[in-house]
From Swiss-Prot:
Pfam families named in the record: EPSP_synthase (PF00275)
UniProt GO cellular component terms: cytoplasm
Positions bound to UDP-N-acetyl-alpha-D-glucosamine: 93, 307, 329
Record's keyword annotation contains Transferase: yes
Chain positions recorded as phosphoenolpyruvate binding sites: 22-23
Protein known as: UDP-N-acetylglucosamine 1-carboxyvinyltransferase
EC number: 2.5.1.7
2-(S-cysteinyl)pyruvic acid O-phosphothioketal sites (modified residues): 117
Biochemical pathway: Cell wall biogenesis; peptidoglycan biosynthesis
Cellular compartments annotated: Cytoplasm
Listed GO MF terms: UDP-N-acetylglucosamine 1-carboxyvinyltransferase activity
Catalyzed reaction equations: phosphoenolpyruvate + UDP-N-acetyl-alpha-D-glucosamine = UDP-N-acetyl-3-O-(1-carboxyvinyl)-alpha-D-glucosamine + phosphate
Classification via NCBIfam families: murA, PRK09369.1
Length: 419
């Protein structure tokens, strides 16, 4: 099993090209099921979860091809299977996003209950309840969600009990082919939801309000394929910016979108970073200074993203002062903390809050990645730790970061993959 070995590298410097957003690419690939003609998606990152999504589509009978330039073409002409099996779904929670498209276009879907990162309960009941309001008959049996509808789904007024990105996306795709208007209230406002809505509209859907808490979808009878470019990955961008801040460096993220990172950029400025932005780039300069501690509370977008929480744990571990980080989105999302403590971080957990007293130095150690973003935080910690850090179980990292070791090397980081 692959590992990463990391050594303290000094201040990161240079340009890093940001990949397409995993969390936008996955639902957009699933939306390919809705298209009656060939669907082409570009700027798709080369990641384990993307490969799993392509394998799932092939398992259903779709033809999926990939070019070297990150372009994926999907044809559903021969799609004739409607079951997403446990073997694929168990490795990636986003597989649940096939449910809405299959049901909307074909009237039937069997989807195994999902797996993915072990970061607490992420219930699927919001997905199921919304589809039931649109006329689906659903039962959960033998570990599978079995959904059926006679004819087309019907437009409905859906109020989400809690904000859920995945449920918003699933219902958005299902409603695109429903009969009549669907209104989703208390919808997720994340940029990835907007990207999916823009893609569906390019396919012929009639969606308005994405990015607000109320989305309106006027169902259409069919959708066509199109060519669509996935948005930049805001979490990858934020991860590199934090790495630069922790190493007291100066980097520029290109092919990025500053508008999607306002909460993160504000916290980096609070930490002492000088931030400059253009339309598609972000530059961070720490001017050789140690970061200042910053308090964080994760919130749904446009608040501070839960997917950046672990990285800011590392920043605060090395910052001047004391800070708290409160996690409000997921339970069990501080599994990186014991690993950082093994590296010398001064942290303690109280419920869903981590109290961090900054120290000047971390020590290299053998650590274990427990989920996707936790693994990124351990790599960042290794870049400033005294000695060698080895990160095990980096298959988590490969689910969400494209060529991470090569990108860090390009900035001067000593990060090596060992088989």
């Amino acid at each position: 099993m692959d590992k990463l070995t990391i050594q303290a590298s000094g201040a990161l410097a240079g340009d890093v090209v940001i990949s397409g957003a995993k969390n936008a690419a996955l639902p957009i690939l699933m939306a390919g099921v809705l298209a009656e003609t060939d669907f082409v998606v570009s700027n798709v990152p080369n990641l384990r979860d993307v490969n799993t999504s392509c394998e799932l589509l092939r398992c259903l009978g779709a033809e999926v091809s990939r070019s070297d330039e990150g372009k994926i073409t999907i044809s559903t002409t021969h799609l004739n299977e409607f079951c997403a099996p446990y073997e694929l779904v168990k490795t990636m929670r986003a597989s649940i996003l096939i449910l809405g498209p299959l049901l909307a276009r074909y009237g039937t879907a069997d989807v195994s209950l999902p797996g993915g990162c072990a970061i607490g309960a992420r219930p699927v009941n919001l997905h199921l309840h919304g589809l039931e309001q649109m006329g689906a008959k659903i039962e959960v049996k033998e570990g599978y969600i079995k959904a059926r509808v006679d004819g087309r789904l019907k437009g409905a007024h859906i109020f989400m009990d809690m904000i859920s990105v995945g449920a918003t996306e699933n219902l958005l795709m299902a409603a695109a082919l429903a009969d009549g208007e669907t209104v989703i209230e208390n919808a997720a406002r994340e940029p990835e939801v907007i990207d999916l809505a823009n893609c569906l509209n390019a396919m012929g859907a009639k969606i308005s309000g994405a990015g607000s808490d109320t989305i309106r979808i006027q169902g259409v009878e069919s959708l066509s394929g199109c060519e669509y470019r996935v948005m930049p990955d805001r979490i990858e961008t934020g991860s590199f910016l934090v790495a630069a801040a922790v190493t007291k460096g100066k980097i520029r993220c290109v092919d990025a979108d500053p508008k999607t990172l306002e909460a993160v950029l504000a916290k980096l400025e609070d930490a002492g970073a000088s931030i400059t932005t253009g339309e598609d780039w972000i530059e961070l300069d720490m001017q050789g200074q140690r970061p200042k501690a910053v308090n964080i509370k994760t919130m749904p977008y446009p608040g501070f993203p839960t997917d950046m929480q672990a990285q800011f744990c590392v920043l605060n571990a090395l910052a001047e002062g004391t800070a708290t980080i409160t996690e409000t989105i997921f339970e069990n999302r501080f599994m990186h903390v014991p690993e950082l403590i093994r590296m010398g971080a001064n942290m303690e957990l109280e419920g869903n809050t981590c109290i961090i007293k900054g120290c000047e130095l971390l020590n290299g150690a053998q650590v274990m990645a427990t989920d996707l973003r936790a693994s990124a935080s351990l790599v960042i910690a290794g870049l400033v730790a005294d000695g060698v850090t080895t990160v095990d179980r980096i298959y988590h990292l490969d689910r969400g970061y494209e060529h991470i070791e090569d990108k860090f090397k390009g900035l001067g980081g000593e990060v090596v993959r060992v088989s």
